[in-house]
Every structure is written in structure tokens, then in C-alpha cells.
Amino acid sequence: MAAPALRAARRWSGLALGVRCAVWNLPGITQVRWSRYAPEFRDPLIDKEHYRKQVSELTEEEKYDLELKKTQLIKAAAATETSSVFADPVISKFTNMMMKGGNKVLARSLMAQTLEAVKRKQFEKYRAASAEEQATIERNPYKIFHEALRNCEPVIGLVPILKGGHFYQVPVPLADRRRRFLAMKWMITECRENKPRRMLMPEKLSHELLEAFHNRGPVIKRKHNMHKMAEANRALAHYRWW
């Protein structure tokens, strides 16, 4: 009985001191890809409206869930989750895609400067317009950003499929998540590769967003080119099922 314990002790003593301390300080190991939390931990609920409800307004199921939370363990909220009224998941995703080298502070600063530049340009246009034209000018940079991305989203894409030793570009309908990703990728690529040397990123990005908002610009042209290629390869559409 003592032999296995002695062999285990010798293996542990052979490790370096730092490795032994790191192993001993590991949290409880689970079977789900070394998760930090055990299966009994619950996901956090980040919703101010839920916590503002009075107990008398809760349903029986919500009251039971509230009693369970008093004795259950709750996971820590992720650093990217927030209950702020200014939180926007689409802008957050765009900021992450624009980030380089993990410098998220710089990416957030560029995004804030871009939205500010969009608003300034629209207000200059608003003040110079007549009373009739002012009603048609959008000044909210968040609405302009979302509408510009929607205008850049392609409906149909091309997927390479191998048939007979050759790759064919087969047109397929794109999911919403893929459409949004391509629109963001094209916008960021256009601003990085075709930006004048002395032009700052917020200035270029704000210009491209306003162009896309009015269905103009190189990003819109790139979307139309993809649609034309999909239309030209419509004879290969049946390769999706064969």
C-alpha cells in the first residue's frame, strides 16, 4: 500500500518548486475544457430591469428562482458585458475587429472619434441646409453606423467547392452573422489599405460610413461585385447539394 504513495511523492518532489505551487493552486478541475467554474455555478444575469422589479411583481417561477440564488454560486460577469444604456454589441464587435496587437484602448478611442466626426459632419450639413432639407438629414451617429453596415451586407456569397479535382465558386445564401462580418471586414480593409498617408483613421472611417449610408462608395461597389459574380456562377448553384 505504501509503494504507490511513495512513487507519487517522488514524482512530486522531482518537480520544480514553481511548478508544484502552480499545480497546487489550480482551482477545481472540471471536464469541460478546464473551465474555471464547476457545473453547479450559474451564469450571471446582467439586466437592470430585472433587478428593479418588486417582489410582488414577480411570478411564481421568478420567486422560486430568486430563492435558489440565495444558496447557489454565481459566475463572475465577463469584462465585456455591461448594463450601460450606451452599450452596443455591433459597435463592440466592430471595435474588436479593428483592434491590432490587443490595444483595445486605442481601438475604442478611434471608434469614439469616428462617431464624433460623423456627428460633426452631419451637423455642418444640417446648419447649411434649408428648412425643408433639414428634416431629411440624420444626425444620430449610431443610426448612421448601423444603416451603413446594413447597406454593405451582401445577400449571396461564394463558397469554393471541390468537384472533379477543381474548385468551383458556388453561390450560396449567407447567414446574418456572416453578412455582418463581411460588411465590417470590407469597411476596415478599405479604410486601412486605401487611406491617404496623412489622413487619420477616424476621418477616413467616418467618410466611408457616410458614403455607405447613402449607398455609395467602394464598399458598396464591392458588395455589388460579389452579387455579380454570384449571378455569373448561378449555373453552379446545384453543386451545393451534390
From Swiss-Prot:
Q: Which domain of life is it from?
A: Eukaryota
Question: What Gene Ontology cellular-component terms does the record carry?
Answer: mitochondrial small ribosomal subunit; ribosome
Main localisation, per the record?
A: mitochondrion
Query: Which Gene Ontology terms describe the biological processes this protein takes part in?
Result: mitochondrial translation; ribosomal small subunit assembly; translation
Pfam (any one): Ribosomal_S7
Keyword match Mitochondrion: yes
Q: Where is the signal peptide?
A: none
Q: Name one GO molecular function term.
A: mRNA binding
Transit pept. (range): 1-37
Record's subcellular location: Mitochondrion
Protein name listed in UniProt: Small ribosomal subunit protein uS7m
Give the organism's phylogenetic lineage.
Eukaryota, Metazoa, Chordata, Craniata, Vertebrata
